[in-house]
Amino acid sequence: MNSPFRLGHASHSDWKTATEIALQQLGPGGGKLGFMYITEAFVPYAAEMLAMVKTQTGIFDWVGTVGIGICATGTEYLDEPAVAIMTCALASHTHSVFSGKERPPRLGSHTANGADAAYFAIVHADPHTPDIEELIEDMAGKVSSGYLAGGLSSARGATVQFANQVVAGGISGVVFSSDVAIGTRLTQGCAPLKFHHTITNCERNILVTLDDRPALDVMLEDLGLDMRGLRTAARDTFIGLIQAGSEASGGGDDYLVRNLTGIDPENRLVAIGDTPELGQVMMFCKRDLQSARGDLLRMIYDLKDDLKEPPKAALYHACIGRGQHMFGEQGAELKLIREHLGDIPLVGFFANGEIARNRLYGYTGVLTVFK
């Protein structure tokens, strides 16, 4: 039996040649929806590439974006001209492409067979859009599951999104009806230390006190370091801001990883890459290969536990700080996913921020499977 999902990907300095190679890999077969991810070298040719894949496949509905890196089954393309394409033979009533120019189905509306028309969405967003976090939360409120998966476009220059046409700015993607069986999980790139702390005094992005103690003293104590040791360890130390009232997939705390941006030894202050709230609970985290690999496998097996049979295809949206930068070898992260999830069609990209549920994350990977 032929799979309803087909995959093609290629790297070549010429956009047309790369697209032709990827299309040839798809082989014969129909489809109603396509995903296309390109690296930034091909941004100037995005419209031509979209026109070409529409003509060659006969598929009108396309979504995707640009990434400094993109991925396919067992492979990642980083800082090289490349394209990854996946087509999906889904019934036409099961999905709806949206953008600033095309509205998604109304929340509460139904398909002809009675399914929720707006159940779950794969989304791509422009990182330069003002109030992007509020926009993501608003979009999550427009699907009945409350779940989104995707990421912010990443490029050193201009970014583009595909949503039946080439668009820029805002948020776009595809909304699926509840007829489409989808599962999604998130993996963190950091391991939290065991202690939780309450932010008892903060000013903008500065942690002044934790548990009514100087923030820097608490951090050094948790890490088991003195100031000299911290200078070496700071690069791999992060802050996890726990999200009140929410639980991560697989149990445990749902937390947002933020950078440690500075310390003030004299005043015992810690600066972070976010503006926390007074009374918010946080923890310090360490980033290393072992914890990243372990949590990636945890995510995969959480997903597999929910599956009655092997998944048909997958999408992977990961932080640009992951991939080769975190796993030490190009393609190592994607090979791990293939090894443990199966040799199935997979496409995605390395994002400037990852979208899961109704939030924007960092240093994470969001894996979505079609059941």
List the predicted regions and their residue ranges.
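Small-residue-enriched flexible segments
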Residues: 1-54, 60-61, 65-314, 319-327, ...
